[in-house]
Amino acid sequence: MELAFGDLKDRATLRSAVAGVDMVYHIAASFRTEHLPRNDMWRTNVQGTQDLLEVSHEAGVQRFVHCSSVGVHGAIEGPPGTEGSPFDPGDSYQRTKAEAEKLASDFGTEHGLPIVIFRPAGIYGPDDLRFLKLFKSVKSGVFRMIGSGEVLYQMIYVEDLVDGVLLCGTSERAPGEVFILTGVRPHTLNTIAQTIAKTQGVELSSFRIPATPVYVAGALCELVCRPLGINPPLYRRRVDFFRKPRAFSIEKAQKVLGFSPKVDLAEGLQLTATWYEEQGLL
């Protein structure tokens, strides 16, 4: 396997990247940042996917594995969610991922290019910094749970995700299918926070903050910060982490791909904490 660097806005670099390649794993995307105009996110996540599909087909690529996101489903009412759960994207990133996924599926059908789509859940582990703020706030003692903490959230350790993605590229039964890739089971936010606290040898505060006023505060922060191109210190999507359930079944990936996550929550969070510490981040 070869890691290719390029620009999804530059077809010439894409052609160079796929030349002589049998299989493409498309994992590049623009993520959530306030300074990024929404049309730029669409240009990267949707048009960039279209361009990569076209040059891959022209180059004779035999399989195209596309990274989507469980975020296309939004909150999961009556969990667990499955690959067939309705789409309900909640922001620009999720909407572009949903559009790109449909585009990839339709392109495969129209042009005969074998497409495999995977939707990862919350990815954590070495080299991922999205959960660093949570670790820091727990370690420093300033963390306060927003809401009850009983909302379900499902995560996947990065090495387990890599195993699942490789199976998407090698399984004979994968083409034409969509797979949710996440850990074996969801956990409450209380459990996740308590497990992080154990990695740091600290006790969590039992004090909780009501979710509704924090959500309103997030909306106000967005109203003030977004016109200025500033990342809000608090925004509704962050509060939604504490409010909306995201729990999924991986039964399809287990049965079709033989997917079997190996790293449980306690081990994965400890490995993540150790990496943060080794990098001087925590």
Regions inferred by a protein language model and the residue ranges of each:
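Conserved Rossmann-fold NAD(P)-dependent oxidoreductase catalytic core, especially the SDR/UDP-sugar
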Residues: 51-93
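Flexible, glycine-rich beta-alpha linker
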Residues: 73-74, 113-132
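NAD(P)H-binding glycine-rich loop region in Rossmannoid oxidoreductase-like domains
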Residues: 1, 5-47, 55, 70-75
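Substrate-positioning beta->alpha
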Residues: 99, 128-133, 146-169, 176-177, ...
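Mid/C-terminal beta-alpha module of Rossmann-like enzyme folds, strongest
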Residues: 167-234, 250, 266, 270-271, ...
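Short alpha-helix in the Rossmann-fold core of NAD(P)-dependent oxidoreductases
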Residues: 44-49, 65-68, 96-97, 154
